[in-house]
From Swiss-Prot, chain A:
Belongs to the P(II) protein family. This is Nitrogen regulatory protein GlnK1. ATP binds at residues 40, 48-50, 75, 98-101. It comes from Archaeoglobus fulgidus (strain ATCC 49558 / DSM 4304 / JCM 9628 / NBRC 100126 / VC-16). ADP binds at residues 40, 48-50, 75, 98-101.
Curated annotation (Swiss-Prot), chain B:
Residues 28-38, 107-113, 171-188, 238-245, 288-300, 364-391 are cytoplasmic. SUPFAM superfamilies: Ammonium transporter. It comes from the Archaea. The record marks 157, 305 as: Twin-His motif. Important for optimum substrate conductance. GO terms for molecular function: ammonium channel activity. Belongs to the ammonia transporter channel (TC 1.A.11.2) family. Its main location: membrane. Gene3D superfamilies: Ammonium transporter AmtB like domains. NCBIfam families: amt (TIGR00836). It comes from Archaeoglobus fulgidus (strain ATCC 49558 / DSM 4304 / JCM 9628 / NBRC 100126 / VC-16). It is a multi-pass membrane protein. Coiled coil: none annotated. Keywords: Ammonia transport, Cell membrane, Membrane, Transmembrane, Transmembrane helix, Transport. This is Ammonium transporter Amt1.
Amino acid sequence: MRRLPTREVVEMKMVVAVIRPEKLECVKKALEERGFVGMTVTEVKGRGEQKGIRLQFRGREVEVDLLQKTKVEVVVSDDAVDEVVEAIVSSARTGKFGDGRIFVIPVEKSVKIRTGEEEV
Amino acid sequence: MSDGNVAWILASTALVMLMVPGVGFFYAGMVRRKNAVNMIALSFISLIITVLLWIFYGYSVSFGNDISGIIGGLNYALLSGVKGEDLLFMMYQMMFAAVTIAILTSAIAERAKVSSFILLSALWLTFVYAPFAHWLWGGGWLAKLGALDFAGGMVVHISSGFAALAVAMTIGKRAGFEEYSIEPHSIPLTLIGAALLWFGWFGFNGGSALAANDVAINAVVVTNTSAAVAGFVWMVIGWIKGKPGSLGIVSGAIAGLAAITPAAGFVDVKGAIVIGLVAGIVCYLAMDFRIKKKIDESLDAWAIHGIGGLWGSVAVGILANPEVNGYAGLLFGNPQLLVSQLIAVASTTAYAFLVTLILAKAVDAAVGLRVSSQEEYVGLDLSQHEEVAYT
């Protein structure tokens, strides 16, 4: 059975940031300036710890449950995680509720589809 | 009025009505998705408020018996005595007023309470739009002075454009305006709006001949020409700076349409080319100036309609060709028309800005123009309408 070519073992992490949609350009720029170009961006809806936002609509209280957010996913080597997190925090923060969250997740391996090359 | 003329004005009325949601779509594409419904809704609200006020007293104070050249009387209130052709004219003019208020919503994009907008638009129609309509079209002091405004360079575009600047300065910038780039959420929606506007403008300018005649034909031809020339100018500017974005191209076309509006029944095609060319340049520079000065007149009613209408109104005094409609401008040996146009432009510009500033500050003080920061964050679709544009 043919084995796919492999590379050296590099600890990888996925940094997942859920941010305000309007902060996407700032975050992209901050990451690019630090040399992190690759990313996956998804439009999502979500809610944080405060569950939702209560607003008075037409004389009655309504909970706005899920708000429009943007999810940015970046896969980097373990030693670059702190720099990526710092870049996202500094560029996405407004100081108000709803600035978002960052999660750091271990990545087992990555396969480049064009070449079949693996990173583990 | 012949049956053909009646048919053309009926059709033109429908064309101008379609421009109202056209403005809504044009603007909605340029805001964030959480405010798209609100921008379109504001255009329909503009139409509804205008229809009601126009019937009650708006038409009368615009076109009723002249009182000292300043305002019309209440002799046509609730359309009493308005019949036949006058009823058709009333309806046609109603749509102009509605479009003008819809244009003004540029200034409050993504941050105004609907209730406050209703109050402001009612006051604005009464104290800015109606006087302008009377001054220029209802036998008021500017008409007596000899100033010309074929289809609304001053009545519609200067009024809404300079009012938008005043309202934007009163309501303040959108949250995050200086922190990050607020991007359009749907360029196709804006392009649909632009298509409706260009289409409707044939009724806006062509219908202002108030007959299906040679002046109407000329108006439609020069309207189309100016739009294309100004759109081309913005396309070239886009190429010089990078790529010719569709948003820029249609914004340029709208600038050309705004600029030709006061002149459509007075200039020939050569004049229209000049008007479109200059409009493309000056409106772009105005937009650039607004951005550099960090003024959040969000969707550029001032730069495109205000400055476009101002230039077009001055251009009438220079380029009016007597072969088109009997009126001669500076280039055809009549400097007096330019003097009249300059007086009219100066007075309408100053009045629109200052009176709107007073009205906006009064509404803000009384009920508050702006939604809460939390409502702005959630978006106006949810906080003002309990709806979303896209699920």
